[in-house]
Amino acid sequence: VTSLNGRPHAERNALNKKINYTGSDLYTTLEPCTHYGDTPPCVNIIVKKKIKNVYYGFDDPDKRTHQKAKAFLKNKKINTKNIKSSNFRNFYTNYIYNKKYNLPYISAKIALSKDLFSINKKKKWITNNQSKKVAHLLRSKNDCIISTSKSINIDNSLLNCRIKGLNNFKPDLFIIDLNLKLKKNLLLEKLIKKRKTFLITKNKNANKTLFYKKKGYKIILIENLEKKNNFINMFKTIYKLGYRSVFFETGLTFLNSLIYHKLLNMLYVFQNNKVLKKNGLNNSHMKFINKIK
């Protein structure tokens, strides 16, 4: 398999073993790369190990490699076949989006009651422990988590993965805090040395930014988040920092903004079977959530 940080690729990891692969068939989901990056091209080690046939499921959308492997390997007398299937394309949904738009794949979650309230006045949680475990699993599958200072100040959440066996997966954290109102001594400060934590703000006050920098936060300055283009510029900045998949955990107000501007690739809705009526509350209207149902 491909290494966790994306390098080396699966082909190189497999063929680097001390095994005689001469005359073997190689099966891989993605077209073997032909370009130099952090590691040499996978086609080089395929040739070196004297592979006879290469079968792959999907043309790499990366322009540096796209549809180049077949010609390269054919020139080296290695048979190559693209086994086309929608399953492979579905598997690489995030990657395709990254390469097409140079933006991170954006997902979010929301928990709702049966009558579409996102807040229970009498209980902290809307859904059950199983839903929470799924949410933690989703965190582990993304490069970073994005929340807002408003949500964090209310919930005081660690925003990490706390599933046994996945504890080491601590996605970096981005906090949207336009006016630098994040509280002091939050639980998440325990993890600042173990993961990168960014504050996205429009506040240029030197004393305030210095205060947060001393605590270990990294500051990202933006103009605002009023228009769709503001959001896209923020996502471009996050993408340039190396984050390819982001997971939003925010309140309904911010989630509405993402939906309104059509910026979400995936929305996970956790809904229980309870009717809250007077015990239910929303910190924003539901019209954009209802629109995509």
Question: What is the predicted function of each stretch?
Answer:
Residues 1-87:
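Zn2+-dependent cytidine deaminase-like catalytic core
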Residues 5-9, 30-37, 51-58, 93-103, ...:
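Phosphate-binding glycine-rich loops and adjacent basic patches that engage nucleotide phosphates
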Residues 69-71, 94-98, 161-162, 263:
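Short low-complexity, flexible loop/linker segments enriched in glycine and/or proline
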Residues 70, 85, 89-93, 132-139:
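Hydrophobic, well-ordered secondary-structure segments
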Residues 76-78, 105-293:
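Enzymes that bind and transform nitrogen-containing heteroaromatic metabolites
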Residues 81, 85-111, 117:
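Proteins enriched for Cys/Gly/acidic motifs involved in redox and nucleic-acid/cofactor modification
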